[in-house]
Amino acid sequence: MHEMKYREGLTPYKRAKYARQEAALLRRDQESQIPIRYRILESGLPPAAQARALKKYQTLAVLEDPTQFCKLRTWLEGVLRIPFGKHHAAPCKSHRSKIKRLCDTKAAMDRWIYGHAEAKESIVHMVSQTLANPHGTPQSIGIIGPMGNGKTTLVRQGIARALQRPFMQISLGGMSDVTLLKGHAYTYENSSWGRMVDVLMEARCMNPVVYFDELDKVSQSDKGDEIISALIHMTDTSQNTDFRDHFFEDISIDLSRVVFIFSFNNEKAISPVLLDRLYLIRTQALQPADKCVIASSYLLPTVARNIGFAPDQLRLAPAAARFLLSQIPSEKGVRQLKRALEHIVLRLNTMKLLNEACRKRTKKADIGQILGTIQCPAAAKLTHVLHFPLTLTPDLLRQLVHPKPSPSYEFMYT
């Protein structure tokens, strides 16, 4: 009775959401109860892969060695997790729906990231092409720009959101072995499949947006060359319908519908062969005026929300943003600026909790003990006089952090 009454009070959106979740959980439970033989027969595996999996299953039935049995079982379970034939579709049939998708894409990028007008325009063009020909072969993309200037956000909130596909990230920084990407051969002990197959399993579709971060940081060695060769193969439209993971060497995996995106800072460090395959989107270094806007309108609201402040409880005055920039090393992005804001807001959060404790007459000894952990004496004295909502000014920031001893933001962490 209570359940029916609760359901009647739900919005249509929530009812549909709960129905989808329940159906997915029941379907997963049913799949786990279906014998492997029938899961192979009912799977979307290509005929050749299906035949190979059935042969493996027949071998499994007569294996006596428990180690080999477990390994072959893992192989079969892994193959059945690859989402063969499943694609995320975002149909926009009418002209109006396509225009709305483009407008939503631009609005989402503007909401999440400031500036980068040329890069945003390039992304809108790319999305337009996909809307015009949704079954076409997607272009591989290279997004260039300095560290911390918003490349990942552009891809996640721009391209992946516009295409309505899962966003999967693979970090290439320092990667020195192609087996991390393509797996180990089945014959090796404790071998498994590689990260590329992993992201397909996690995305549960064969056309996710796969974002390779720090392409220019791949190891400069023979092993690094093997990684680049694998990436060239994966982005080659004449070959990527037949990708082979080392663990599933007999199974052909079609990567032709995957949207591959690579980010890098140094264009000269990229293999010319791979670079030639990429549609390049360039992002620029952020200017001080841009950083001030980003700090007050983008970074502070995000940091404050993550730490637990209400949206209107903290505001950064323009002069305070300029002061903060003067206290950190010159950078082309905003990573250090974000770290500085995080430290300040964390300190403010502790002071806010102590302020509330004072009003509730918490033991002075307890409050004093926590105040002793705040290493900035001026900040500790502010605890009793801060009131929220609060506007951060240069004078307040000077009291919240230690005086600048050197051209480094590290003073904020002492």
Where are these regions (language model features)?
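Extended, charged alpha-helical coiled-coil/arm scaffolds that mediate oligomerization and mechanical coupling
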Residues: 1-132, 153
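Conserved C-terminal "switch" segment of AAA+ ATPases
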Residues: 42-49, 204, 266-276, 280-342, ...
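Walker A/P-loop
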Residues: 132, 136-172, 201-202, 232, ...
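The Walker A (P-loop) glycine that initiates the GxxxxGKT/S ATP-binding motif of P-loop NTPases
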Residues: 145-146, 183, 214
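AAA+/SF3 P-loop NTPase mechanochemical coupling elements
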Residues: 203-208, 243-263, 315-316
